[in-house]
């Protein structure tokens, strides 16, 4: 429950995120970002349980807003390990980008955010609209880089091309009417956006 509201945004939600990429889909303001922040411990629930508890996991988060500086930016700037070099190569990160984040374009800043998130090699990685502000070639770079991640990946995105290329399952936020109440439910369906949409329609 957020301050100033009497009803919880999410109530009775039960979702399991498996290894691989799960796309979180639904209308704006329905609770997608809230759910993902709960999953990685950036928000705490009023009730219910998250298992395993986020403090037992190494988590990564890439925000939607490109103005937010990655928490590990300085570490990434000084990281010349083979893993970091491969991430830089895949995403086309300039050597000087981490030292001048305020001068980067939206697409460049987004790539740098994603690079920093991947460089921490997290158990769970949440990406909120990772292809905002990018053109098609950059999207392809991002997709190629994300395919190398083998943990639990959670995508909040409206980019159908990205979801179809990456997701092995989709968590669909849907509005339902149960016992006289309008509630939000989350249904996890197998496959990418196209497959999950067909499954939901059947």
Predicted regions and their residues:
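ABC ATP-binding cassette signature C-motif
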Residues: 1-201
